[in-house]
Amino acid sequence: MERTLTILKPDCVRKQLIGAVIDKIERAGFRVVAMKKTRLTQETAGEFYAVHRERPFYGELVEFMSSGPCVPMILEKENAVADFRTLIGATDPAQADEGTVRKLYADSKGENIVHGSDSAENAAVEAGFFFSAEEVVRVD
């Protein structure tokens, strides 16, 4: 079983779409093995997105991700990383396929409802950023 990390971003929480997005995730065959609601500080958001520090959108991303509560989750499924990225769609909702999370719910490239890990290796690192081993519940 592969795992991936997702974050339901502040726009998702603000628009009261947590349940709708989790429903799509579970209907797609993913199991939620860890989940919490938290609020990132600018410092914490900056650490999480440090890989983008030199990108022009970094400051806006950090500001947005610290603007309200978010819901990080670890999801489990065969081929979890690729399947989840397919489920959520392109970063820009205008480019996302019909029926994807971002096409359905996102307003813009910057406020696009959800983060999804881009590799199994990054998923493991990102999951460790939010969750201790004790917080991950094995689903059999």
Curated annotation (Swiss-Prot):
It catalyses: a 2'-deoxyribonucleoside 5'-diphosphate + ATP = a 2'-deoxyribonucleoside 5'-triphosphate + ADP; a ribonucleoside 5'-diphosphate + ATP = a ribonucleoside 5'-triphosphate + ADP. Transmembrane segments: none annotated. Its EC number is 2.7.4.6. Its main location: cytoplasm. One of its GO terms (biological process) is UTP biosynthetic process. ATP binds at residues 9, 57, 85, 91, 102, 112. CDD domains: NDPk_I. It is found in: Cytoplasm. The active site is at residue 115. It holds the Pfam family NDK. Keywords: ATP-binding, Cytoplasm, Kinase, Magnesium, Metal-binding, Nucleotide metabolism, Nucleotide-binding, Phosphoprotein, Transferase. One of its GO terms (cellular component) is cytoplasm. Its cofactor is Mg(2+). PROSITE patterns: NDPK_LIKE. GO terms for molecular function: ATP binding; metal ion binding; nucleoside diphosphate kinase activity. Homotetramer. Belongs to the NDK family. Major role in the synthesis of nucleoside triphosphates other than ATP. The ATP gamma phosphate is transferred to the NDP beta phosphate via a ping-pong mechanism, using a phosphorylated active-site intermediate. This is Nucleoside diphosphate kinase.
